[in-house]
UniProtKB/Swiss-Prot annotation:
GO cellular component, one term: cytosolic large ribosomal subunit
Protein name, entry field: Large ribosomal subunit protein bL25
Gene that encodes the chain: rplY
The protein's role, per its UniProt record: This is one of the proteins that binds to the 5S RNA in the ribosome where it forms part of the central protuberance.
Pfam families per UniProt: Ribosomal_L25p, Ribosomal_TL5_C
Native source organism of the sequence: Desulfatibacillum aliphaticivorans
A molecular-function term among this protein's GO annotations: 5S rRNA binding
The keyword RNA-binding appears for this protein: yes
C-alpha cells in the first residue's frame, strides 16, 4: 500500500463557526489520534486530500502527515471521513496514527475479474461481500483482492477460504462465508435476507461517514 504525503496545520479553534470558515478557505477540520498519543486537532487542504483519494477508498491509503512545526511526519490512516450528502465534499477527517510493527484490522476491497461460465448460461453474478476484513501489519495491507470468476458455473461460489492471500495476511472471520456466487435467474430475483446483491450498495456534520472502520489496531 502506497504512502502519500499530506500537509497539515495545528488548529486551535473549535466549533461549527470556525469549521465553516476553514471550509470556505479550502480546508477541512481534522483530528489525529492513536493508542500512544494525545489527540491533535488539525486542518488539511480539501484539494490535497481529494487528489490523494481520487478513485480509491479512504481506508486504502496510508499518509505521512507533515504537521507544521513538528519534528517528523506522523504515519496515519483515515479512521472516519465525513462527507456532505449533497455536494459530496469532505467535512471532517479522523486520522488514526499507526505503527509499522503493530497489526491492524483493515477492510480491503474485492475486485471481480472475468465473465463466468454461469453468466454465459444465463445466470447472474452476485457479489455478496465487496470488502473483506484482514489483520496484518501496515506494510502488508493488500490493495485489493482480485477474484477470477471465469470458471464459476450456476450454483457455484467463491468462499472466503478460496480468496488468494499472502501468508502475512489473516482473515479474522471464522465462518467460511460466500464472497461471490452465480445464481439462476429465478433465484436472483429473490435475494436471501441480509445479503447485498451486485447492485445493492448504499451510498457527519450533516454528512455520511466513509471508512468508519478503516483501521483499528489488534
Amino acid at each position: 500500500m502506497k504512502t502519500h504525503e499530506l500537509k497539515a496545520s495545528p488548529r486551535t479553534t473549535r466549533g461549527n463557526g470556525p469549521a465553516r470558515a476553514l471550509r470556505r478557505e479550502g480546508f477541512i477540520p481534522a483530528v489525529l489520534y492513536g493508542p500512544d498519543s494525545e489527540p491533535i486537532t488539525l486542518s488539511v487542504s480539501h484539494k490535497d486530500l481529494s487528489d490523494i483519494l481520487q478513485g480509491v477508498g479512504s481506508s486504502q491509503v496510508m499518509f505521512n502527515l507533515n504537521i507544521e512545526g513538528a519534528d517528523a511526519p506522523r504515519k496515519a490512516m483515515i479512521k472516519e471521513l465525513q462527507t456532505n450528502v449533497v455536494s459530496q465534499r469532505y467535512l471532517h477527517a479522523d486520522f488514526y496514527e499507526i505503527s509499522m510493527d503493530r497489526k491492524l484490522h483493515v477492510m480491503v476491497p474485492v475486485v471481480v475479474e472475468g465473465k463466468s461460465k454461469g453468466m454465459e448460461e444465463g445466470g447472474l453474478l452476485q457479489v455478496i461481500r465487496r470488502e473483506l476484513e484482514v489483520i496484518c501489519l501496515p506494510g502488508d495491507i493488500p490493495e485489493e483482492f482480485v477474484i477470477d470468476v471465469t470458471e464459476l458455473g450456476i450454483g457455484e461460489a467463491v468462499h472466503l477460504s478460496d480468496v488468494p492471500k499472502g501468508d502475512a495476511v489473516e482473515f479474522p472471520e471464522s465462518a467460511d462465508f460466500t464472497v461471490v456466487t452465480v445464481v439462476a435467474p429465478t433465484a436472483a430475483a429473490l435475494p436471501e435476507e441480509g445479503e447485498e446483491g451486485e447492485e445493492g450498495e448504499e451510498g457527519g456534520e450533516g454528512g455520511e461517514a466513509e471508512g468508519a472502520e478503516a483501521a483499528s489496531e489488534e
